[in-house]
Every structure is written in C-alpha cells, then in structure tokens.
Amino acid sequence: MMRLKKWARELAIFIVVLAAFSWGMDQWRKPQPPEISHLPDITLVNGQTVSLAALSAEKPLLIYFWATWCGVCKLTSPMVEELHKDGVNVLSIAIRSGDDERLMRGMAAKGLTFPVVNDQLGRLGAEWDIGATPTFVILDKGNMISSTSGWSSRWGIKTRMWWAGL
C-alpha cells in the first residue's frame, strides 16, 4: 500500500512538471502576431481573398502554419482536415512549400481540402514570428487567444478552440 502511494505521488509530480514544462515551451515559442486589424487581406491558392479579422469575428479561427517538407506536419495535417470537415473555422498557411500548383497537387494526393495560403517565401511566417512548424494559432475577434507549436492531438486543438469560444 505504501509503495502504491509513493508511485501515485511520483506520477502526480511527474505530470505537474510535464505540464509546467509544456506550458513554458509554449510561452517561449509563442509567436508575436502582427496587429490583426492592420493586416492586409490575404489570398488563398484558389484566388479567394480573406480577412483574418473577418474570419475570426463570428467564431474562433484556427490558423495552422505548416509545410509540405515538415515531418510532424504529415501527422497533424490529417487531424486539421478532420477538424475542418467537422466545421471548425480553419485557415492554413503553407510555409516555403513550392508553387501553388505543386502545393495543391500534394494536398489533393493526401485528401486535404482545408483553405490554404501559399507562403512561398516565408514572409507571413516571419511576420508572425513562426519559429517551428507546425504552429497552431487561435484567433477570436481578431485577438490571439492561444498558440502551440509541434504535435498536438485533435482533442487538444478542439479543447483550445472550445476555450477560445467561451
């Protein structure tokens, strides 16, 4: 019985330390977005022009910074696609992933249909201070509510989106 209590205490300490470390890493890697209201509209690869402020006005917007060459993004992109199909407000920004035709061909081959902006030269990524892909940024009413970099689960992102909508 004493041994079980010791293990439970050590597990609880480990979970608290892991959560604190994860939160600290998110704060350290947190992007510094530009002033959303001053951003020009951006153009999707399909030619549609969108405003981030307008997209996040009614419900939270998940901005997914990713790249076709990113190994972790190959795991997270299908999850983002599921969220998009579930009705989550998603906009993706593909950083340095080739020309529009190549990007769209690659997305079609993987069954990815979420809206995408092609950031061929990495200017948007730099403007948003994106240091790693994938990075998930959640905007609500033009304000950044949450961000995280690296792998995240579908439920982790859904929870962040739910929290942003409160």
Residue ranges and their predicted role:
Residues F21-A53:
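N-terminal "domain-start" segment that seeds a small globular fold
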Residues K74-K110, Q120-A126:
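Structural microenvironment flanking redox-active thiols in thiol-disulfide oxidoreductases
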Residues A108-L112, Q120-L166:
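Thiol/disulfide oxidoreductase modules built on the thioredoxin-like
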Residues S51-K74:
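Short active-site neighborhood of thiol/selenol oxidoreductases, capturing the structured segment around
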Residues M1-W7:
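Short, Lys/Arg-rich N-terminal segment immediately upstream of the first membrane anchor
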Residues T43, P115-D119:
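Short acidic-hydrophobic, aromatic-tinged amphipathic segments that line or gate anion-handling sites
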Residues A8-G24:
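Hydrophobic membrane-insertion alpha-helices, especially the h-region
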Residues L62-I63, V90, F136:
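Hydrophobic beta-strand anchors of alpha/beta hydrolase catalytic cores
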